[in-house]
From Swiss-Prot:
Species in which this protein is naturally found: Lactobacillus acidophilus
Main location: secreted
Any Gene Ontology CC annotation: extracellular region
Propeptide stretches in the record: 1-20
Organism phylogeny: Bacteria, Bacillati, Bacillota, Bacilli, Lactobacillales
Record GO biological process: defense response to bacterium; killing of cells of another organism
Coiled-coil segments: none
Stated role: Has a bactericidal effect on sensitive cells but not a bacteriolytic effect.
Domain of life: Bacteria
Record's subcellular location: Secreted
Keyword set, alphabetical order: Antibiotic, Antimicrobial, Bacteriocin, Plasmid, Secreted
NCBIfam families, per database record: bacteriocin_sig
Name of this protein: Bacteriocin acidocin 8912
Length: 46
């Protein structure tokens, strides 16, 4: 079951992944997201 908050976060993540508009265009957020995405890649073996 997905809450509205989780869906909103997912939409933002999709926007970041696709390189589209983002609600958090700050360098800090991009750095955090990059680190998070890298950790996902290593964990899931992408």
């Amino acid at each position: 079951m997905i809450s509205s908050h989780q869906k909103t976060l997912t939409d933002k993540e999709l926007a970041l992944i696709s390189g589209g508009k983002t609600h958090y265009p700050t360098n800090a957020w991009k750095s955090l997201w990059k680190g998070f995405w890298e950790s996902l890649r290593y964990t899931d073996g992408f």
